[in-house]
Amino acid sequence: NSKISEDNWTRAEGGGGTTYVIGDGDFFDNCAVNFSSIYGKKLPNAALAKTLNKEVNFGYQAAGISVISHPKNPHIPTSHMNIRIFGILDKDGLMCDWWIGGGYDLTPFLPYKEDIIGWHNDAKKFLEPYGANLYKDFSENCNNYFNIPHRNERRGVGGIFFDNLKNFSSIDLGISFLQAMAVTYIESYIKIIKRRRNS
């Protein structure tokens, strides 16, 4: 019985997206799902600091999906997930460089050790086939990214976060990695929801 609102937007420079907001139901206090796909002309070199092809910069394309979930039940944590891909175009309009980014994290109101351990174990299991150190690195990235300096603490109990990732031989493999990460997030979060929804 939730209400779902849809907001479509466009960007003058090129592209647009859709935002869905879910609320006023039995489960969500508020939930937002954002889709975006944009394109444009040459980027400033500052935006290309970590790519190899600064000199080949005739345009760009970027796409992303983000999710933020605020359940009504305080025993179920807030969660956040986003995936994104960025491509640089050459003078013929072909993608000549690309990278991916994303991650997910968990913010409990009433922390349960079982949920936190399971959350991190699922992330570690997902990442192990891609590299022995990825979980450690991505988990540290998440902790640093969501650090709140003036409070000397971090937001929530962590997760994984990465940016400018190009550890794949093709863009298709990079996209497959993002898809697998999104599925891991959904499955891991649903485990917690099922465990706590009647608390």
Describe the residue ranges of each PLM region.
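Long, contiguous internal "core" modules enriched in hydrophobic/ aromatic residues
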Residues: 91-198
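N-terminal start-of-chain detector that recognizes signal peptides
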Residues: 7, 53-57, 132-133
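Internal mixed beta-strand/loop scaffold within catalytic domains of large alpha/beta enzymes
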Residues: 17-100
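Alpha-helical context
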Residues: 11, 57-59, 136
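Gly/Pro-rich turn-and-neighbor structural signature
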Residues: 1-51, 170-199
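Flexible, active-site-adjacent loop/turn segments at secondary-structure boundaries
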Residues: 7, 33, 74, 102-104, ...
